[in-house]
Amino acid sequence: MATVNPLSFDRIFAKAPVMAILRGMPLEKSVELATRAWDLGIECVEVPVQSREAVEVLAAVVAAGAERGRPVGAGTVTTAERLAWAVSAGAAFTVAPGLDAEVARASLDAGLPHLPGVATATDVQAARALGLDWLKAFPASVLGPDWFRAMRGPFPEVPFVATGGIDASNAAAYLAAGAQVVAVGSALEDPEQLPALADLLKH
């Protein structure tokens, strides 16, 4: 039986249509950028765990988020081992670039909402069959805004997170096309993009 988790993506993404991804950064830099994201009004932060070293970074950002009541998730959770890392670091949810049924089920059983990557209608149907409500459209910059418009036809009830190649210059276009949330990374390091990101959070 799956563990009951008070968090769901409906709650995680309720306050802001933007998620921050902190990939491959040193611990102190990750905490700094997570804090910048929270100060902007971005509620949700993801730290990918592609190595054991990244687990320490995730744990530090989780601790910083706990002080503010902000959820921090583990990204690139593609194996059972990485799921174990996410659990040990205190992640609130897991994210993956693709859809792996075993990883998805294991994450849900561990009490962590799972956000799998999808790129086709077949992917969407498979993910929904596993009971996954929110889906990550990846890579969004390759799929393009028209992908979201097209998917609204057969899947009007599915909320998508546009991920991959999103920054302040194109985020609004993806939201207008039907993405419920956009995920940004390096944009947080660019002072010129911060005002535009802040504007997204006002709508």
Residue ranges and their predicted role:
Residues 41, 90, 98, 111, ...:
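Conserved functional loop/turn residues at catalytic and ligand-binding sites
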Residues 49, 76, 97-99, 118-120, ...:
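Short secondary-structure boundary segments
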Residues 52-54, 81, 102-103, 122-124, ...:
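Short secondary-structure capping/turn micro-motifs that flank functional sites
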Residues 79-89, 122-130, 147, 153, ...:
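Catalytic cores of alpha/beta
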Residues 93-106, 136-147, 177-197:
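Glycine-rich phosphate-binding active-site loops on the catalytic face of alpha/beta enzymes
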